[in-house]
């Protein structure tokens, strides 16, 4: 599919996933049944926006991610929170990215396990951050920021599974 401003992408969440209260933060996504390695769990949906659309306030703040240079996926301003945004962060997540909108399992995920993703896989806004991470992972960074994708240990851990824009930056600049 050729991405262009205004296109609406329908979200998809595997029916083996449920959203419920999370010990990490607010609401989270949990496996109703186990998943094997490299299984598609979620395809983000939303509207494709330009930077101009964002500046004009057409996109809901907090729902936007860079999917190509100059193009963003997010919900329209005023839209209710969708279930595909109930995915909590972990510094050693059990999901990662297959492409700009598809999230897959890194390994086997057991029934009742919370599905998590490291926000460094797509977050590029230097002003964005989580002051206190509560993931509890041995790899916990303590704080999470919009430039964490530049950390060598994350580039090694998640090689090939960042958002394509970030993968391109890593290859071009050699962070």
Name each model-derived stretch:
Residues 89-175:
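C-terminal SET catalytic tail plus cysteine-rich post-SET Zn-binding segment of SAM-dependent SET-domain
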